[in-house]
Amino acid sequence: MIATDIGIDLGTASILVYIRGKGVVLKEPSVVAFDRDTNKIKAIGEDARLMLGRTPGNIVAVRPLRQGVISDYTVTEKMLKYFIQKAVGKKTFRKPRISVCVPSGVTEVEQKAVEDAAYQAGAREVAIIEEPIAAAIGAGIDISKPCGNMIVDIGGGTSDIAVISLGGTVVSTSIKIAGDDFDEAIVRYMRKKHNLLIGERTAEDLKIKIGSAFKRPEVEYMEVRGRNLVTGLPMTVKVSSEETEEALRETTSQIVEAIHS
């Protein structure tokens, strides 16, 4: 019987699975697609994401995690079990030891929900680690030293800000402003500035490719296709990195304020 040690970053937008000795073996969206008529799960992760917009209206997408915590326990449990089995494979193995990252501001009840979901998904042992600690270790910082390290971990649903020293968290805060809010800000900006309706995936592409929190020395451009809110017809707009900086300014400033406080 083969024992496995697994690390899971249970994010609002995506899930990463790490296996000791192999590294990150899986990164997929935290999305579950299910049939609204039968209430049965049709796909999980990347397969679920690919189904969106290409399937009948009875297929809907669910994000079982919201702002870093479980919003749908049953679906989260099934999603975790699916990803663990996919990462480990079909071979016979002892129940794995699992470490799961959670935002620094989660309550005991929320933490217990994550722990229970991991056990129900097949864990032998479960360890809960605060995301800033995991981020610091992953960045190669020696957190055992007697000096302060500030960590800012911007996820999909939450941003964690912490000062870490001597192996522990000195002070921390978790705000529910993060990557999803950047996407929504871009969607709002495109609607207001260009009368163009775009989806979350298109907004995320814009953010990743030319998104900026400050003015760049060189302006970058990207063509975006959506629906004209005036005519209802498809329309393509050329968007600049200067525009994304403007779109993200308010959301970025909220994270900066949290860091300063």
Name these PLM-found stretches.
Residues M1-I154, A162-S261:
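Nucleotide/phosphate-binding catalytic cleft detector across ATP-hydrolyzing
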